[in-house]
Amino acid sequence: MQYINIANRGVKSLSPYQAGKPIEELERELGISNIVKLASNENPFGFPESAKKAIFEQLDKLTRYPDANGFELKQTIAKKFGVQPNQITLGNGSNDLLELFAHTFATEGDEIMYSQYAFIVYPLVTKAINAIVKEIPAKNWGHDLQGFLTALSDKTKLIYIANPNNPTGNFLTSQEIEDFLAEVPENVIVVLDEAYTEFTRSEERVDSFSLLKKYSNLIISRSLSKAYGLAGLRIGYAVSNPEIADLLNRVRQPFNCNSLALTAAVAVMNDDKFVEKVAENNRIEMRRYEDFCQKNQLDYIPSKGNFITIDFKQPAAPIYDALLREGVIVRPIAGYGMPNHLRISIGLPEENDKFFTALSKVLKFA
């Protein structure tokens, strides 16, 4: 029996998501130690002590189900951003939410729109529900918003826009986003995926929550895996108008956020100083990457995230493999249609030093 023959038609066209190679896997494969992983845009600075304390206090309660509605976390988010708890949907990471949006608002025959070189989860969820992929060609590695507007049709139900974008790091300004929203029909849902927004400077950051008051078709999606350092716990949240949130929570699986994640999320979201320190350290180390690339005449895409994408002007797979042998894991992105590029997460200073040394050896820089 070939079970693919009875699978959902959309599933047949999918390939499994390829995450960044784990350190333990490389240790097994090559028998090397002191490996540096700069592949998954994780927070190298960890998470604050307040979150660790909150997790330990929760351990004795793990025989009980978590709060299915995430009351305390919703209250924390609402207070922090000036929204109402009934506007919030919680997810098992923002990936969970990105899939939830598609299941709630699109079905077979509907169009879901996103940019070329956008987060690979967008096409995955689109194909999984048999919706129509509407990939808009990129403009300077980023979103061509006019291209989105031109491509709109009566079948368009959902638009995903990551800002900053992953894996390219491009960034749209508040004005660009508002001008775009003003042209999108009210019956088309726009998802603003802000997983990396905390790495932008406060003065340039999009005030997306204020846009909710004007555009009822907007959903803001955020993650606590990046700047907040909770990637292993899987927790994210979406903010929208209450009617949309109600629909999302009808589809959302019960108990989709575990007790430890909910508890740690409350702690980290109350620790602004920690996140500010993480963002500032990221900017310092990002400048080192930019200086390294400029010194060695490597083209890169300017990034507002916690990663940088380098164009090697040749197939990057051999460079990736050579870096693995040097004990450095980065991210090949041929699956994004960028076979000449590698994406490198910004790490601790000593981790970045190891990358600079390894790449210099691989490319034989003087």
Curated annotation (Swiss-Prot):
Catalytic activity reads:
L-histidinol phosphate + 2-oxoglutarate = 3-(imidazol-4-yl)-2-oxopropyl phosphate + L-glutamate
Q: What's one Pfam family here?
A: Aminotran_1_2
What does the record give as its pathway?
Answer: Amino-acid biosynthesis; L-histidine biosynthesis; L-histidine from 5-phospho-alpha-D-ribose 1-diphosphate: step 7/9
Gene Ontology terms: biological process: L-histidine biosynthetic process
Please list the residues that carry the modification N6-(pyridoxal phosphate)lysine: K226
Under Gene Ontology molecular function, one entry of this record is:
histidinol-phosphate transaminase activity
EC nos: 2.6.1.9
Instruction: Summarize subunit and interaction data from the UniProt record for this chain.
Output: Homodimer.
Name of the protein in question: Histidinol-phosphate aminotransferase 2
Q: What gene name is given for the protein in this entry?
A: hisC2
